[in-house]
Amino acid sequence: FSEGPSKGIYFVYTGVNNTGVPYKLTANVSGAISFMQADRSEYSTLIGQVRDTRLPNRVGNALIKVNQELINFQKAMYEPGENDKEREMALKAEAESMTEAWRGKPALKIPVLPESISVKSMADLSGSEQGIAVGLDTESIEAVYVKPGETTAMAVTGRVGCGKSTMLQRIGQMVLEVDENTLLYCLDTEKKSLAKLQEKGTAYARLSEVEKVQDVFAQILKELMSRMQRRKEAATKIEKEPWIILLIDDIKECNSLPDDIQMQLHRIMTKTKGYGVLVLCGIRQGNLFNFYTQDQLGVDLKSSGSALALSDTAVHYEGFYKNNFAQSQRNAELEKGFGIFFADNGGRKIKCIDSQEAGR
């Protein structure tokens, strides 16, 4: 009995009560399970001192000693039935009876990651205090936010076809649902991926329409100057102002704009902290290195430290954004509908807003 384990032989025995198991056996076992006993002394005979441990109080409830620690657990219950359906119903009835008998604190609901995330559900979680909810953290199932004014520029990136443009469009729809007074400006490509926002947004232009782009920046800068003046004149702190959101479908195409217009965008991206401004810039993952190292607007975008990646692995972005993932997470390919949110020198895997409708 005592030498069996060294030869791969193990014994499992049962007894009706503590006196039904001889001492010679209990003295040579490495583990024991005790179901309901009459009092604490009977538990002690089998598994040692129980002290303040919660004792078994119903059928199937037991104590087990693991690494000198007593654990109270519920064994799997046999459920009668001729088929799976009958056994399922019997198990459900048993679970309901256990729930009715429970007198302790109610268990917390286990959060479950939804299959898809609607624009409206994220709009309901967003607000001037929290910021814009762009998705749900896959571990905590809590909303992940980017706050305009604290973050003034953020990249939305990934390979061709991952849904960058769709993501920008969904965020544009959402911020208007959060506050219809949001000032939403869109700079689009010739593919007109953001055209659906043209009617409800404040201003819309294609990047090839230089005069219209100039007018968009003029409107934004005018609003910023107005806010600065109001704050200067206000006797008390201005608590709330509508967000200023600028969506750029492909910021790399801004290279074709005149230098003075690019300089205006540079000012909007870097000199507007605290004024509710956020510039969301779509850019292909393959263009990041050259854009971030050779272009002033790229330097501005990278220096914000925030990005939402919609494809590839965390490793693909480590040259630009830090993360604290384990090795397996770093090398894991993003599934469709998920992203990595980079911010505050870390990365979080998220389920993206309405991301099942991926576009370009």
Across the structure, where does each feature detected by a protein language model lie?
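P-loop NTPase catalytic phosphate-binding loop
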Residues: 1-41, 45, 53-54, 117-315, ...
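Conserved P-loop NTPase
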Residues: 38-107, 314-360
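Basic- and hydrophobic-enriched, low-structure N-terminal and domain-boundary segments
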Residues: 78-80, 91-141
